[in-house]
Swiss-Prot record:
Compartments it resides in: Mitochondrion membrane
Top-level taxonomy: Eukaryota, Metazoa, Chordata, Craniata, Vertebrata
GO CC entries: mitochondrial inner membrane; mitochondrion
Annotated motif Substrate recognition, positions: 241-246
Name this protein carries in UniProt: Mitochondrial thiamine pyrophosphate carrier
Reactions accelerated catalytically: thiamine phosphate(out) + thiamine diphosphate(in) = thiamine phosphate(in) + thiamine diphosphate(out)
Example GO molecular function: antiporter activity
Keyword tags: Antiport, Membrane, Mitochondrion, Repeat, Transmembrane, Transmembrane helix, Transport
C-alpha cells in the first residue's frame, strides 16, 4: 500500500525496502516509456504549430514524429539521454516514495491523516516530489538537453555534456527551469498520490473484492487514471520548464525549425501567448498524456509489487 497504514503495520516495509522499491519502479518505468518522452520533448520545444497544414512544422503527430525520428536518427534516438534519465528516475523514485511514506506517518501521528486523507496525500505527495526534484534537477536538465539535440550531436555523451555546459554556461545552467518545475511538480505529484488513493477506493466500490488476486491490475489502472488527471491540470508548466531548460542551446535546435530565446518565466509565457496562442501551452499533450498514464500506472504498479515482494521474502525468512 502507498502511504502509511496503521492497520497494516505488521507488513510495513523498512526504509531501505521503500527506497529500493521506489528506485526499481523508476528504473523499469523509465525504460518502458522513454520513446514517448523523447517525442513529447520534441513537441514541446517546437515553435511551429503541430499541424500537417503548416509546411514549416517538422512534427505534427505522434506516429509521424516517431517515423521521422526513426528514419533520420535511427531507433537509438528514442533512448537519447537515457543514461541521465535513468539516474534521474532511480534517484527520484527512491527519494519520493521514502519521503512520502515518512510524511504520511508523521501526519498520522499528529492525528491529521484519518479525517483528511485526500488532502494529506495531496500535500505529502507534493512535498515528497518537491524534495526529490531539488535532489535530481541537474540530471533532468542534462536529460532534456541530450533528448532535444538532433544530428550532428552537440554532446556525444553525458560527461561531455556536463563539461561543456559548465564551461560555456556556468554552474547555474544545471538549475535552469527549476522555478516552474517546483511550481508544477507540487500539484502534479499531489494529484497523482491523492487521485490514486481515491480511484482505488472507487474501484473497490464498483468492483468489490471477492478474494481473487486482482490487486496488481487495480494498481495499474488506478495509476494510469491518476496520471492522466494530474498531467492534464499541470501540463502548461511542464512545457514552460522544458523550454527554459534548453535556453542557451538554441544552435542545436536549428534543424528542428524556429528557435527562441527567453529571459525568464514571464517572458516565455508572453512570447508563447503572442506567437502560439493558448494552444501553444498544450503542445505535445497527446504523447504526454500517454506517457503520464503509462508512467504513473507503472510507477505505482511496480512500487507496490516490489513492496509486497519484500514483505513475502521477510515472511518466508521467519
Amino acid at each position: 500500500m502507498v502511504g502509511y497504514d496503521a492497520k497494516a503495520d505488521v507488513r510495513s516495509n523498512s526504509k531501505l525496502e521503500v527506497a529500493v522499491a521506489g528506485s526499481v519502479s523508476g528504473f523499469v518505468t523509465r525504460a518502458l516509456i522513454s520513446p514517448l518522452d523523447v517525442i513529447k520533448i520534441r513537441f514541446q520545444l517546437q515553435i511551429e504549430r503541430l499541424c500537417p497544414s503548416d509546411p514549416n512544422a517538422k512534427y505534427h503527430g505522434i506516429f509521424q514524429a516517431a517515423k521521422q525520428i526513426l528514419q533520420e536518427e535511427g531507433p537509438r534516438a528514442f533512448w537519447k539521454g537515457h543514461v541521465p534519465a535513468q539516474i534521474l528516475s532511480i534517484g527520484y523514485g527512491a527519494v519520493q516514495f521514502l519521503a512520502f511514506e515518512e510524511l504520511t506517518e508523521l501526519l498520522y501521528q499528529a492525528n491529521l491523516y484519518q479525517t483528511h486523507q485526500f488532502s494529506a496525500h495531496f500535500v505529502c505527495g507534493g512535498l515528497s516530489a518537491g524534495t526529490a526534484t531539488l535532489t535530481v534537477h541537474p540530471v533532468d536538465v542534462l536529460r532534456t538537453r541530450l533528448a532535444a539535440q538532433g544530428e550532428p550531436k552537440i554532446y556525444n555523451n553525458l560527461r561531455e555534456a556536463i563539461r561543456t555546459m559548465y564551461k560555456t554556461e556556468g554552474p547555474f545552467v544545471f538549475y535552469k527551469g527549476l522555478t516552474p518545475t517546483v511550481i508544477a511538480i507540487f500539484p502534479y505529484a499531489g494529484l497523482q498520490f491523492s487521485c490514486y488513493r481515491s480511484l482505488k477506493r472507487a474501484y473497490d466500490w464498483l468492483i468489490p473484492p471477492d478474494g481473487k488476486q486482482t490487486g496488481n491490475l487495480k494498481n495499474l489502472l488506478c495509476g494510469c487514471g491518476s496520471g492522466v488527471i494530474s498531467k492534464t491540470f499541470t501540463y502548461p508548466l511542464d512545457l514552460i520548464k522544458k523550454r527554459l531548460q534548453v535556453g542557451g542551446f538554441e544552435h542545436a535546435r536549428s534543424a528542428f525549425g524556429q528557435v527562441r530565446s527567453y529571459r525568464g518565466l514571464l517572458d516565455l509565457t508572453q512570447q508563447v501567448l503572442q506567437e502560439e496562442g493558448t494552444r501553444g501551452f498544450f503542445k505535445g499533450l497527446s504523447p504526454s498524456l500517454m506517457k503520464a498514464a503509462l508512467s504513473t500506472g507503472f510507477m505505482f504498479f511496480w512500487y507496490e509489487l516490489f513492496c509486497n515482494l519484500f514483505h513475502c521474502i521477510r515472511r518466508e525468512d521467519r
